[in-house]
């Protein structure tokens, strides 16, 4: 009996370890019920307001489309996403979609999905793999273009400056597609004029708390900061707290340009604490569900689908805020 009790306890612990795998909809152990398309979605985490809006869009759109959604939160850990994807393969879902924590290290698990004849859709973030057959399509933003837009705003804003323009950069999650590409696009633009210099650059992990912490360190180590470039609004909002605590005025003493355009960021822009925001649209749910149905039916889809996005200054932020969904 003691041996049996130990086995039951081990089984219960293993089940608890999979608590991140949460079925939404009718659920169940089979890949689908009543012929419904089943989607296994491995979300990167809940690190920001953008990500929360993205998750909500996916969950609501799946319900509206009649798609059975099995959803997991990887808590920003690649190993959790890989475990979730393997679980979806075992459950024989019709389609797998995920937003990769980082760009590399996916080939093995995606080959497992391919061998199981389960199509994969990349959402929001791309992967770095020479084998493009491992996924059907990518749905999301052009992160390099977002970085370029931020750089173009900066060069226009400081075009008449005669001295060196000192820039600090809050990067996203190390190794992630948006962090790599937003940095690349921004750097390409400012490289055209040597007066623009990034004097400090560090990851803020896309979170408000880390953005504040890193900005505090920048302020202590750098006597003159002209501009903050934040890879997302949440880090910019954390940085604003640090700037104000240091007795400086965000948006004036230190100009701020960020990416996302979530509601809190837009409010800071309307209040003059952020100077410019490049939009990254999180509401991918409707487009994703359309793609899920198509690939489940064996239809051909484009290899890359980019979302339409804009930019905001203070006036346009004030106009957009009343109807902002996220």
Where are these regions (language model features)?
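A residue-level marker of the well-folded mature domains of exported/periplasmic proteins
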Residues: 2-7, 24-326
């Amino acid at each position: 009996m003691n041996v049996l009790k130990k086995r039951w306890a081990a089984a219960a612990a293993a089940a608890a370890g999979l608590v991140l795998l949460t079925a939404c909809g009718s659920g169940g152990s089979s890949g689908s019920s009543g012929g419904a398309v089943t989607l296994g979605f491995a979300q990167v985490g809940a690190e920001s307001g953008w990500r929360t809006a993205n998750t909500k869009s996916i969950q609501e759109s799946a319900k509206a489309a009649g798609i059975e959604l099995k959803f997991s939160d990887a808590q920003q850990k690649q190993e959790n996403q890989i475990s979730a994807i393997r679980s979806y393969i075992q459950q024989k879902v019709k389609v797998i979609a995920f937003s990769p924590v980082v760009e590399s290290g996916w080939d093995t698990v995606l080959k497992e999905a391919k061998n199981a004849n389960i199509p994969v859709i990349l959402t929001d973030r791309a992967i770095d793999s020479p084998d493009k057959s491992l996924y059907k399509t990518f749905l999301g933003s052009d992160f390099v273009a977002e970085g370029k837009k931020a750089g173009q705003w900066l060069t226009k804003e400081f075009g008449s400056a005669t001295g060196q323009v000192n820039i600090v950069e809050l990067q996203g999650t190390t190794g992630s597609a948006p962090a790599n590409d937003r940095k690349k696009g921004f750097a390409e633009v400012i490289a055209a004029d040597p007066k623009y210099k990034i004097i400090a650059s560090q990851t803020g992990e896309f979170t408000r708390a880390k953005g504040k912490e890193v900005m505090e360190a920048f302020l202590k180590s750098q006597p003159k900061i002209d501009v903050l470039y934040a890879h997302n609004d949440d880090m910019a909002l954390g940085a604003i707290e640090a700037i104000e605590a240091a007795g400086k005025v965000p948006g004036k003493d230190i100009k701020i340009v960020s990416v996302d355009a979530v509601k809190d960021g837009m409010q800071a822009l309307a209040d003059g604490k952020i100077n410019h925001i490049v939009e990254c649209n999180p509401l991918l749910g409707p487009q994703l569900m359309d793609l899920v149905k198509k690939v489940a039916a064996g239809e051909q889809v484009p290899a890359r689908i980019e979302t339409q996005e804009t930019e905001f200054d203070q006036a346009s932020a004030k106009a957009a805020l009343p109807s902002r969904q996220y």
